[in-house]
Design a protein with these regions (language model features):
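Polyanion-binding catalytic cores of nucleic-acid enzymes and NTP/SAM-utilizing transferases
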Residues: 140-319
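Residues immediately flanking
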Residues: 1, 48, 95, 202, ...
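Active-site-adjacent structural elements in folded domains
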Residues: 28-29, 278-280, 346-351
Length: 370
């Protein structure tokens, strides 16, 4: 039996469409196309997640360079199969040079029951020039607007790595505290004030603003209080120093010792100490001390908020920190135009919520202003 690392290595060597988080059905497209003869056609019914997901990027590029797509049907969130909850697509392709994408969306059972007529009446040709990112299937007016946005002049380009994830504690009830506990911990040891940070949680968010319910984070990075990048793995020396120098905090967290030790078992007590945050964002901790724009990963109200300096961010939220553009970005991201744009290129929940992953938000077209 192959271990996971070897398994992934072999797949990456054999398939150009494979990435570490690819769904295996993507590999069947490439293998099927390789096996086709000159006049053969390939038809697959699969999940439609490849159309917009990050892992589908390699597959979309493969189609653009290796295939002629005859028909693509996106059923969006329409549930076609009675015994399988899956968002579905159908694609028919053959070997050859990619031409314009001939595709249509089907969003109701009535359209599905008259499939041939629906394909004829709703199919739209999409230019290759706007298929560099997620594939969008829509009417001509929407595609024209999308193309204008994608080729917006004087754009602000933020690097993908500037978009950050919030801190993952692994056990919120241990690390997220209220004002009462904060005051007790600081009263017993004044230096704890440097460890306890104001934090923003997802349930604090309104549109454009947030409720300050006085939540605080006990910020304990790996190997705290030692600051030695050479430390590999959980350090008993770090724990003993933490117990000695921050006894009140140590005793408080020790009340959760059993639950904290049962977090990610492949890392807790191995890569980091039982009392440390699971993901402390140590490589970009300075961003928490800047103005920020924050939003929920599962964003059901299209909420983006301005977050002042010194607020830390919890894992249900993503954010981007920028001293100059933060307030401007809140207005841009919150606009109806960008809400519409997301619906074209992003992924939605079945209840209409927005799956606001970093990979989608980081691709938003933003107009530069001086």
């Amino acid at each position: 039996k192959l271990d996971d690392k070897t398994y992934k290595k072999r797949l990456s060597e054999q398939f150009t469409v494979y990435s570490g988080n690819s769904d295996l059905y993507c590999l069947f497209f490439e293998k099927g196309n390789d096996l086709l003869n000159k006049n053969g056609c390939l038809a697959f019914i699969t999940s439609n997640k490849w159309l917009k997901s990050m892992y589908g990027d390699l597959l979309r590029n493969y189609f653009l360079n290796k295939c002629e797509i005859i028909t693509l049907i996106d059923f969006k969130a329409l549930q076609i199969f009675k015994k399988a909850s899956v968002d579905t697509s159908i694609i028919v392709s053959k070997k050859g040079d990619f031409k314009n994408l001939n595709a249509c969306q089907i969003e109701s059972l009535n359209e599905y029951n008259n499939l041939e007529d629906t394909i004829k009446s709703k199919s739209i040709q999409t230019k290759k020039s706007i298929l560099s990112g997620p594939w969008v299937i829509n009417n001509k007016e929407s595609l024209n607007l999308l193309e204008k946005l994608k080729h917006l002049e004087n754009r602000i380009f933020f690097k993908r790595e500037q978009f950050r994830y919030g801190i993952k504690t692994g056990l919120n009830k241990a690390f997220l505290i209220d004002d009462k506990i904060k005051k007790i911990l600081i009263q017993h040891d004044k230096k704890n004030i440097d460890i306890i940070k104001p934090v923003l949680k997802g349930d604090n968010l309104n549109r454009f603003s947030f409720n300050s319910n006085k939540h605080f984070l006990i910020y304990i990075p790996w190997h705290f209080p030692l600051h030695n990048e050479g430390i590999k793995g959980a350090s008993n020396k770090a724990e003993q120093k933490f117990k000695k120098d921050y006894k009140i905090l140590y005793d408080y967290l020790f009340k959760f010792h059993s639950e904290l030790s049962k977090r990610n078992k492949s890392e807790t007590g191995i890569s980091y100490e039982w009392y440390a945050l699971q993901r402390a964002a140590s490589t970009y901790v300075n961003d928490f001390y800047k103005p920020k724009v924050a939003w929920m990963n599962m964003n059901r109200g299209w909420k983006f908020v301005y977050v002042p300096k010194n607020y830390f961010i919890e894992a249900s939220l993503n954010f981007i920190a920028d001293d100059y553009y933060a307030k401007y970005l809140v207005g841009i991201y919150s606009s109806n135009l960008h809400k519409w744009y997301f619906k074209q290129v992003g992924r939605m929940f079945d209840d209409g919520g927005f799956m606001c992953k970093v990979d989608t938000i980081s691709g938003f077209p933003i107009k530069y202003f001086a």
